[in-house]
Amino acid sequence: MYKRQELTKDQVRKIALEQDFVVAKKKDSTGICFIGERHFKEFMSNYIPKNPGQIIDMESKKVLGNHLGVMFYTLGQRKGLNIGGDRGPWFVVWKHLKSNKLIVAQDHHPLLKPTSATIDRINILKDDLMFPLDCHAKFRYRQADQSVTLDFKDGKLVAYFPQGIKAVTPGQEAVFYLNDLCIAGGQVEEIYFESKPLREWVEREVKDEI
């Protein structure tokens, strides 16, 4: 079920209820569109061969288990790691493609919350923007509005969020708003923690393991 031009999705759903459409009460999906009721890994494994590797705890440097292939996981992911324990949940901090290792940490680890990102493939939708400016951003579907400071440098947007935001991932789309007006968007190119690329922090922490 989709929003339509001037109608919000809630308004469309209300109309569907009034018309007794069968999809009126169908819950929203956050998965891949049009593949039906299939699990993400199951669907992707039809097109990407599995490539098992180790799951590494960034703090202890211990091997916690094995993954099916780093391409089946996303930064910030919690479910589906199959490495549960008494200490609490684990989250994906980084996917090291060269060594085929999945780097994880628990919720308290600061690197789970990057503090800035560069955005390329940009579209600026408002001509009179004065940078830097404070606005709101969304980095994934149905995410609550995130407060950011947006700047423009070397042909790219740079979003600063010193409070840290979980699960900002290279390749994701980023959309920026002033009040209810969409002012810009683009694709996350690189994520940073305290002005250094996150990948450099991770590679320094686990250099002997990768």
PLM region spans:
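Nucleotide-activated chemistry modules centered on ATP-dependent adenylation/adenylyltransferase
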Residues: 3-201
